[in-house]
Regions:
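Feature for soluble, non-membrane regions of globular proteins
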Residues: 6-130
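Positively charged n-region of N-terminal signal peptides that target proteins for export
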Residues: 1-4
Length: 130
């Protein structure tokens, strides 16, 4: 089983910090180590700690993360569980050495249709971001 799937399964079942499948500096220069350290090491850790402090003695104590997010009413348990899930999915989607550098399939077709090429898309995207 790959690291991403294993980490996600462990996190969902036990409300633990997911293990990143890359070093904290592996995404530089796109995402800095400082950003990873702050958002992974502080934000996500705080949400995990909060959730683990909130669920004991509630109906959510033995439930997995997805079930908590799907069934908890608005409030602290729902918010922290949702943040754990969102942050985990965010961090686990990245790879320091992507297997492909350009989109494929329907996304590639839409980019080519709307921008002419992936290079043109990147130029326009970067210009719009400034």
């Amino acid at each position: 089983m790959n690291t991403l799937l294993m980490s996600l399964m462990i996190m969902i079942m036990s409300h633990e910090m997911p293990k990143l499948p890359y070093a904290n500096n592996a995404l530089e220069p796109v995402i800095s180590q400082q950003t990873i350290d702050y958002h992974y090491g502080k934000h996500l850790q705080t949400y995990v700690n909060n959730l683990n402090n909130l669920v004991p003695g509630t109906e959510y104590e033995k439930k997995d993360l997805v079930t908590i997010v799907a069934t908890a009413p608005d409030g602290a348990i729902f918010n922290n569980a949702g943040q754990v899930l969102n942050h985990t999915l965010y961090f686990l989607q990245f790879s320091p050495k992507p297997s492909q550098s350009e989109p494929t399939g329907k996304l590639a077709e839409a980019i080519k249709r709307d921008f002419g090429s992936f290079e043109n898309f990147k130029k326009e995207f970067n210009a719009a971001a400034r």
